């Protein structure tokens, strides 16, 4: 289960209008000021440090577990060279507030929002909302067709579901829920897989 924004035939204003009022207003207000949150994008593993620090902060704050720092660095070293995996940061006054790791699939023309984290100060400035809007518009401006939130809770989930808050956040950007069949394996060596 995921949530996908389809860009085909849409411009930035149309994508923005599909977002909830909070996200629309935050983006418009931030875009109209010189002192607002700014963004940087990188495909270099050398820029992974702030993101991994943010993920550790989120893990401690929310009691979740993320991959090791080496996992994220390896993704960037391997896929970043081809501009298929990158990091975006939201800054205010030169300080990183929020960061996100994304992957681009050129065959499906899709950007995937894989991992994101922030420091506590990010909430005060809505940096996470602004960063996700930035990524969505970056994907649109790169000529991609889709932006995949990479996982949401089932649509009928109530507030007790562990992904409820995160899923509500992801859905507030105007995408549509999509359900896939899941992952399947096909054994290639019959003797190894017989029960």
Predicted regions and their residues:
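A conserved beta-strand-loop-helix scaffold within acyl/acetyltransferase catalytic domains
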Residues: 1-123, 138
């Amino acid at each position: 289960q995921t949530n996908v924004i389809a860009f085909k035939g849409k411009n930035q204003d149309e994508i923005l209008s599909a977002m909830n009022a909070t996200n629309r207003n935050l983006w418009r207000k931030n875009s109209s000021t010189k002192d607002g949150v700014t963004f940087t994008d990188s495909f270099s593993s050398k820029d992974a440090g702030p993101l991994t620090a943010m993920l550790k902060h989120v893990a401690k704050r929310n009691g979740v577990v993320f991959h090791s720092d080496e996992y994220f660095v390896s993704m960037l070293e391997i896929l970043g060279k081809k501009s298929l995996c990158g990091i975006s940061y939201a800054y205010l006054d030169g300080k990183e507030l929020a960061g996100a790791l994304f992957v681009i699939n050129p065959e499906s023309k899709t950007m995937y929002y894989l991992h994101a984290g922030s420091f506590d100060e990010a909430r005060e400035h809505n940096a996470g909302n602004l960063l996700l809007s930035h990524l969505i518009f970056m994907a649109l401006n790169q000529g991609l067709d889709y932006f995949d939130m990479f996982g949401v809770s089932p649509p009928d989930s109530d507030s007790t579901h562990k992904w409820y808050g995160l899923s509500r956040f992801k859905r507030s950007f105007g995408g549509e829920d999509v359900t896939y069949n899941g992952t399947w394996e096909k054994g290639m060596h019959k003797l190894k897989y017989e029960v």
